[in-house]
From Swiss-Prot:
It comes from Baumannia cicadellinicola subsp. Homalodisca coagulata. PROSITE patterns: ISPD. The keyword Mitochondrion does not apply. This is 2-C-methyl-D-erythritol 4-phosphate cytidylyltransferase. Keywords: Isoprene biosynthesis, Nucleotidyltransferase, Transferase. PANTHER family: 2-C-METHYL-D-ERYTHRITOL 4-PHOSPHATE CYTIDYLYLTRANSFERASE, CHLOROPLASTIC. The record marks 162, 218 as: Positions MEP for the nucleophilic attack. Gene3D superfamilies: Spore Coat Polysaccharide Biosynthesis Protein SpsA, Chain A (3.90.550.10).
Amino acid sequence: MTCLTRPLPNVVAILPAAGKGRRMQTTFPKQYLTIGNKTLLELTIYTLLRQPCISQIIVAISPDDYWFAQLPIAAEERVMVVTGGSKRVYSVMRALRYVKHVSWVLVHDAVRPCLHQEDLICLLTITAHSTVGGILATPVRDTIKRAGNIANVKTINYTVVRKDLWHALTPQLFMLELLKSCLQRALKEGVTVTDESAALEYCGYQPLLVPGRADNIKVTWPEDLQLASFYLSQLTNTHNK
């Protein structure tokens, strides 16, 4: 997709950051793991702050989170903190209550700090021609197997045809009122919402797929932290050239 060069509308970004991150095997939420002297959450926020059209970043944190207030970025003028919920979708819904004076809202994983500015701009420029929104995504490259279970042992059931399969990434960008209504309907009707685009799909919309870079990883497992550190070092080297 061609990234247009045009003035971008003001956008509010939401970071659901109330999760515990138990798969990281840490004693505190994974968004507060550090690379260098900054937490993953700070690195993610700073990436978004580089875009002037992002007028506000709303961070939804756990009610018992005492880490965020200790971070220097908590005093940043464009950063607002709200209390999140027990699931991602509840955190996003609570944050949406505070979105004012914009037509577009962007949702980004709190532990996805390796976002390239070029990808972010490409996503933001879909506001020129879409009335729904879209997500960053990458085509599936690896062979995908559907698992079976025999005597409590995982086995290969069959191979999934990967043509037209994409990995959903974040950020995900949608019209504010449309995202609100789709999330509300999905929750009311008991639909499991794993990301924001799933709610729009359920309501019959087809968000755009905006090709992004595969190094825009979400830190989920312990080994991801070292990989994210490497990717960020490459980003820093590129910016310093």
